[in-house]
Amino acid sequence: MNKTMKPANPMKVITGPDTRWSYANVWEPKSINGGTPKYSVSLIIPKSDTKTLAKIKTAIEAAYKEGEGKLKGNGKSVPALSAIKTPLRDGDTERPDDPAYAGCYFINANANSAPGIVDADRNPILTRSEVYSGVYGRASITFYAFNSSGNRGIACGLNNLQKVRDGEPLGGKASAEDDFATDEDDDFLD
């Protein structure tokens, strides 16, 4: 190992390229329920991406071990990992009416500072319309323990994003390109 390299952070994960981004608030921070404005994205991970899911579960366990003191708080013992909130959620049970989440897990990741956003060749993406809810890409995320206002658990921080490919926009709105893709004149007055 190169002596100048930092040891790998066991709580950091790079998701696979089939991760889909939803609720992508990555250009401007957004306040949720009156809270502090944050950059955020919901990462939709196919259940078939067992490699990414295994890395996430390992990172959640590492965050739990690293944060035992914080999770214990003023209590006498650390709550079991199975008894606290974790960010990996099942789309089939928590979002049964949303086809984008079918057969997937999802994680809501957020950050106080803007994530770096690059394309498949690692060039910065500066055009906001290139990144939208529905694109596919990799995400650099870090898991950490929290204990605030009586809520304890593991949360997910958003570091950086890499767009891999376009996808069907989520949210039901067709793009202008799709709306006007036909050469036909749909004027009903003809």
Segment roles from a protein language model:
Residues 118, 123-190:
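Compact mixed alphabeta submodule
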Residues 69-150:
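Structured, beta-strand-rich domain cores
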Residues 1-106:
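OB-fold ssDNA-binding interfaces and closely related basic DNA-contact patches used
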Residues 42-44, 108-110, 162-164:
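Residues in well-ordered beta-strands of folded domains
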